[in-house]
Amino acid sequence: MNVIGLDPGLNHTGWGILSIEKDIKLIGNGVIKTNNKETPGQRLNKIHKELINILNSYQINSASMEEVFINKNPRSSISLCYARGVLLLTLNAMNIQVFEYSSNYVKKSITGNGHAKKEQVHFMVEKILNVEFKGTYDISDAIAVALCHAYSKNNF
């Protein structure tokens, strides 16, 4: 079974795909980046098209992402919701079931601490999968939610 974890954002949407059989293997990951000089509609369309390409490249059985939370900055929350909406629409159109988890639940399932910092989540994702990531936390956050899904569904 392959599950995609998604970390939505209008600027950067992280994604990670896990193969879950007797063990868990990371089989793909990346970031969908948009140009902030483009209109929101153009940026959302890019997220939509790139997600379709990713989904068509792997046999995805389910998807997971964090539930919406209200950020201190209302504009950030609105942009996040735009990206989430496009992801949910795209996944639904491709008949991929989406599972959502609270941020605290994801952190607790990966680190043992529901209030862990991004650095701790990143470190544990690397440790669990025996891989090393460079760059932003978008990828490790996406993989963390996919791992959380695997753990919560006892899929391995």
UniProtKB/Swiss-Prot annotation:
Primary localization: cytoplasm
Cofactor remark: Binds 2 Mg(2+) ion per subunit.
GO biological process: DNA recombination; DNA repair
Protein keywords: Cytoplasm, DNA damage, DNA recombination, DNA repair, DNA-binding, Endonuclease, Hydrolase, Magnesium, Metal-binding, Nuclease
Chemical reaction(s) catalysed: Endonucleolytic cleavage at a junction such as a reciprocal single-stranded crossover between two homologous DNA duplexes (Holliday junction)
Residues annotated for Mg(2+) 1 binding in this entry: 7, 138
InterPro entries (alphabetical): RNaseH-like_sf, RNaseH_sf, X-over_junc_endoDNase_Mg_BS, X-over_junc_endoDNase_RuvC
UniProt: Mg(2+) 2 binding residues: 66
Protein family membership: Belongs to the RuvC family.
HAMAP family: RuvC
Subunit structure: Homodimer which binds Holliday junction (HJ) DNA. The HJ becomes 2-fold symmetrical on binding to RuvC with unstacked arms; it has a different conformation from HJ DNA in complex with RuvA. In the full resolvosome a probable DNA-RuvA(4)-RuvB(12)-RuvC(2) complex forms which resolves the HJ.
Role noted for this protein: The RuvA-RuvB-RuvC complex processes Holliday junction (HJ) DNA during genetic recombination and DNA repair. Endonuclease that resolves HJ intermediates. Cleaves cruciform DNA by making single-stranded nicks across the HJ at symmetrical positions within the homologous arms, yielding a 5'-phosphate and a 3'-hydroxyl group; requires a central core of homology in the junction. The consensus cleavage sequence is 5'-(A/T)TT(C/G)-3'. Cleavage occurs on the 3'-side of the TT dinucleotide at the point of strand exchange.
Designated name of the protein: Crossover junction endodeoxyribonuclease RuvC
UniProt organism field: Ehrlichia canis (strain Jake)
Name of the gene this protein is made from: ruvC
